[in-house]
Amino acid sequence: NIYARALYKSGKRLAACDQYAVSGDMASIKRVIGNYRSLAGIKTIYQQSPNSPSLNYLVQDFVNNVQETLDTKPEDANDTEWFDLIDAKRIYRKEALEFVNFANTVGNDNKSKYPCLWLSAAAMVNYLLGNQQQAMNEAAQAINANGTPRMRDNARAIRMLITTRSSQLDDNYTAYLLGELRWLDSKIKTERHNPSVYDNHYSDVKDRVIHKGIEPLFAKSGKPLVALAVCDMMRKEENDYYRNIDNLEEREGYNKYQMMTHWPGDEVYVQMDSLTADQLLSYYKYITSTPTNALEQYVVTRTFKDEQYFNDLIGTKYMAEGRFSEAIPYLQDLTTEFMSNQAISIYEATRQYDIERWFHRQKTNDEWDFAKVTTNKKLKFCKEMLSLQSQASIAREGAPLEDIAYKLATRFYQASCYGDCW
């Protein structure tokens, strides 16, 4: 932006920043106006120019910084390094409350062309600070205040988020949520087809409303299966989006089952892994059913429900609980194609569960990504365990029983988290 750069070099910092703001050059705005990323800086610019385009950036930045200060950072992250990494400023409660007071003043003093911006910012900060009623009042006021279409949309989304903290899940409220989610979906669809804008803003909005609002609301209302389904809905939408923009299906060697691996970085898998086999089966039955509630119907139709994936997960859960006969109906339907495209395929293909691990460690070439699996070892394991347990129940005391017990111990250890197989 040649004009903005010329303004900056001539000492007209605010004018230059306004020009960058108009053109949407966020990187340049941060460089030019970085010292104003605080309430004091916002007040200074507002006094100079109540309708400065730079204020749009600074207000948004301030609210984001309040959110980042309150949000949980990674456990192993140093505070200073983490905020530097995400380019955020720490905003504490006193300054945040002072901002709320200032934003409400600006939103009602008729000097700003866009009171919606200020009132919705006040609502979001109050929500983050736990001031529920004040946040709700400000959001309602913001929706009816003057602002750009994006500002008014943000105010509407903020109101939706605020309602999740204190509402009851009755028919009226779930109907409201369904309408708002469908509205967000329409906004997502529109922005995805507009190359001139960041194409994930409303997806980010929906993600926060789901994970910070709707998911915990269902959980605390005694509906854990719905809460998990809501979480999975967002995972699937995100995975579908990135699979499409990365053209994964057109890549050589692509296999859909490689997108269905179980790993600890997948928040939905982590939640499912904490369930018992019976609970996991109940969840699968729920997402493959047709709930009577319209909002729940909306959710389950958007969840991931591949039969191979869940057969593996449920069967393995039953196997882990020692319920081998119940595991077999699920494990026996697994295909070698699915098993060959799982992260543990190298172990299933090359390691044996009947080798005593206390004597032998089965090493593999860990550079392999996937390996061709030709035998369903989990199924074979379950059948062998049932046979050995049956033999043990009728074996005589002494060497025969000891031999069977040793074989059982070998297999139990190999099948555990300390073993080599899975």
Describe each PLM feature range.
Residues 1-422:
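Extracytoplasmic/secretory-pathway proteins
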